[in-house]
Amino acid sequence: MSATITATSATATATQKKPFYRILYVQVLAAIVLGVIVGWLWPDIGKNDWIKAMGDGFVKLIKMAIAPIIFCTVVSGIAHISEVKKVGRVAVKALVYFEVVSTFALALGLVVANVLRPGAGFQGQSNAAAVAGYAKQASEMKSVDFVLHIIPDTVVGAFAQGEILQVLLFAILFGFALMGLGERAHTVRSFVDDVAHAMFGVISIVVKVAPIGAFGAMAYTIGRYGPQALGNLAGLIATFYLTAFLFVVVGLGIIARIAGFSIFKFLKYIKDELLIVLGTSSSESALPQMMEKLEILGCSKSVVGLVVPTGYSFNLDGTNIYMTLATLFIAQAMNVDLSFGEQMTILVVAMLTSKGASGITGAGFITLAGTLAAVRPELLPGMAIVLGIDKFMSECRALTNLCGNGVACVVVAWWEGELDREKLRVALDRNVDPTDLEVAVTTG
């Protein structure tokens, strides 16, 4: 089998380059800046419900397509595999990678918090009542409930409610069922492939309004919380962003180098998705486009279909960093000394409470409450200290989660021998808009 890769639009792109104002990431970046200005100078306009609806509406438009895209991608990936062992092998390798990297992210948060001590000498006011709702939800998050929640009551309900893990479970079972039918399932496989292409077409239409969503989300955030919300806790925000930067550039950078690619070229390749996530504070808003780009990058459809959706529940690197860093910040702000043993307990508990958090509203804050409730309940009132700035840190959590899952997919594909090196080189090295890059594979 040989793969012939052709970048059919490379020449056209070079000679007829898009005007800069028509490039998506330029539009999104401009919308974010405009949103900050509107929210800062005219907060009453910024926090208007209609402005908020712009951001919420865009995220909902993306989310409406996530479940069918994941279902079709996973089913198609598994159904086209002739070897059952291969699916299990990919899943095991993905989970091993997730646990190792997640542990590193949690440990990095602990180390940075101990070295920089952003909560030491904190002077501020907290309102314990403000976090009562989050703490209540966290108390209901038990391991057995999480496992049972993966199994849907009905298949229709899983799709209707957008429960990613439930859809993923059904897709895996359905894919194996089609695999067992062999050639008799050819028509169904073709239908699933066609639906997947149609859904990606829907996303390509929806993503054109990303600048509107980014503007609305940013204008509302600044208008609602105000720039002064950043002032009092700038130390924690700066520490969190610094830690996430180190994790992506150094941690993921080393992993990427081992797998044979540059983290900087990879980040440039997914710049559109990063800006969409920055504007919406939701890593799920870029999931469909991310899956499509990873296939263009050379990852096999089966690896992309299994690793990326699973990573949104088991590989939340940004959330992991946030939980250990915020826990120590709260302890320092409340003058509570945590022993080494207690910090190791926090790491282990956070590893468990973070699983499946992506499907929960206010996931980072709720999992933080779950971790504190399990380790040091007396720290729960201190969550009110970070409540006001949690929104400003959610962007960084989402960006880090997206980067982590993208790198994870490429690494697992490389580990499994399912990474097309030539496609990887073409996609990362050519000065071509990735969305314009057509990759044709000819089997001979």
Curated annotation (Swiss-Prot):
It is found in: Cell inner membrane. One of its GO terms (cellular component) is plasma membrane. GO terms for biological process: L-aspartate transmembrane transport. The chain crosses the membrane at residues 23-43, 61-81, 95-115, 162-182, 198-218, 236-256. It is a multi-pass membrane protein. Keywords: Cell inner membrane, Cell membrane, Membrane, Symport, Transmembrane, Transmembrane helix, Transport. HAMAP family: C4_dicarb_transport. Responsible for the transport of dicarboxylates such as succinate, fumarate, and malate from the periplasm across the membrane. This is C4-dicarboxylate transport protein 2.
